[in-house]
């Protein structure tokens, strides 16, 4: 896992207390596969206020599904029977209390990010096999996901399985097209952009035309995530659990997904999905530089002179001298490059296919920069230049 680059001042301050780095032993493929059998998956459930994410979690808590799921609720609808069982006030402060339900699920209420609740939950390991974490309606799921992603790299007992975003059919379009001051991306749009699974809820409350408009807008923002439509947040668990959106198992289905990525233009062009495929292999160090310029330095401009902001990155790439297809994943300033379980059949098949979700993205500029910095084929190489790159700060 590669974290964000610190400023020069921060680096100098950090260097004074920086411990000596020591080499660590990396796990082989078999050990990594075993980890996913023993670790507990975490799915983040997000969505704008009133979209139905708490209804979804309450549905899971009360249905019989033969799964032992621990659910961490951050918000409750008024009059919730589950809320009354969980919200225990002491000294004017709400604290968490784990409640074991009849269907084998565990549930608690928290008023923070849920990380503390998960730490306490791990003491009950053996009583559950899955964790669902609800974020607040205005939360950026990418920030929460990044914490779990980094934690997994440090040998945690949990791993991030996926991000589910619930969208209200009646008010979703209004939320997604709401303009924020100073050019900021609104919360609902960011939640859709980061989702691996998007649930369009309350479809019975709108006309087919309204639903089509919402579908088009969602697809223009996130052309990679799977979209399901539902009423009253009822969905089969197989559609939202065990997505493996961030681990090596995602490479098995990722190739098919990349072939059907939707890149329809977004109405206001603030958040879009762009994708391209380049034949041949890349040098790993060159690929790292390309990604770091996008995610860390944020110094790549589009044709209008605006710096591109990548919120989500995903792709399958061919790395020179490696037989496996490599999975590249990125959220905000974190990214990872790891081997998939699939090998390239032959050199003629090798290619790099990338999907970017973000704002001010320009496919032509991204593809040319990739070719300049990464592509191995000599006929695809162009001389390095500074065009399209912002000055470093």
UniProtKB/Swiss-Prot annotation:
Keywords: Chaperone, GTP-binding, Hydrolase, Nucleotide-binding, Nucleus, Zinc. The gene is Zng1. It is an enzyme of class 3 (hydrolase). It comes from Mus musculus (Mouse). Pfam families: cobW, CobW_C. Present at high level in the nuclei of the ureteric bud cells in the developing kidneys. Gene3D superfamilies: CobW-like, C-terminal domain, P-loop containing nucleotide triphosphate hydrolases. This is Zinc-regulated GTPase metalloprotein activator 1. One of its GO terms (molecular function) is GTPase activity.
